[in-house]
């Protein structure tokens, strides 16, 4: 179990036209992506962050009220599940399923949990991120380990750089300004789901 406050989450409520234009120029789409990833035999990480998704990724074509889930396993490589995840009928179906499970005292079993070593949660990984801002002093807030690209203009500015996930987690409240948008540019998890 990982407490929700220890997981970095960042949404798309501050996305701007300039972010969408940038994505189109790079032939990618911006998707809100939740990831749980085995970093090593001893560690895993998880986060929710907008991501630049290339056409080669399964989730590139997931639009509107649909959700997509990619699962990678040692024995079966990759599986992709796709379906409606929002709207009145999918939501009602999920609620009804939960109510029926509760009424019938159904509980999930986690048999492997008792004999497998549980990996530890870590935020000690590096992400490559795009941070667009207008007025917020992003460089004064975030400590990038490397800056790859910077752009400034009257309308908006952005920086692309490497940063520790732990740094994003520690500074997330200071990034909640309405003029800041953050997106992952997959490098650490490259080729995890294509």
Model-found features: residue ranges?
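Catalytic, metal-anchored helix/loop core of enzyme active sites in primary metabolism
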Residues: 45-132
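A conserved regulatory-domain signal marking ACT and ACT-like small-molecule sensing domains
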Residues: 96-194
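Substrate-binding/catalytic subdomain of NAD(P)-dependent oxidoreductase enzymes
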Residues: 1-61, 66-68, 87
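Residue-identity detector for glycine
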Residues: 11, 23, 68, 73, ...
């Amino acid at each position: 179990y990982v407490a929700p406050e220890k997981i970095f989450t960042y949404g798309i409520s501050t996305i701007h036209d300039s972010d969408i234009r940038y994505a189109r120029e790079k032939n990618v789409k911006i998707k809100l992506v939740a990831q749980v990833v085995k970093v090593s035999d001893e560690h895993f990480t998880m986060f929710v962050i907008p991501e630049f998704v290339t056409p080669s990724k399964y989730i590139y074509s997931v639009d509107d009220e649909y959700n997509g889930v990619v699962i990678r396993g040692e024995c079966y490589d990759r599986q992709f599940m796709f379906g409606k995840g929002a709207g009145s009928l999918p939501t009602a179906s999920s609620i009804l399923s939960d109510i029926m499970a509760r009424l019938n005292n159904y509980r999930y079993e986690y048999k492997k949990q008792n004999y497998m070593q549980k990996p530890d949660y870590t935020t000690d990984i590096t992400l490559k991120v795009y941070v667009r801002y207008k007025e917020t002093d992003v460089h004064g807030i975030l400590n990038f380990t490397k800056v790859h690209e910077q752009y400034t203009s009257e309308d908006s500015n952005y920086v692309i750089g490497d940063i520790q996930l732990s740094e994003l987690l520690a500074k997330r409240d200071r990034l909640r300004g309405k003029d800041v948008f953050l997106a992952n540019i997959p490098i650490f998890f490259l080729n995890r789901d294509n």
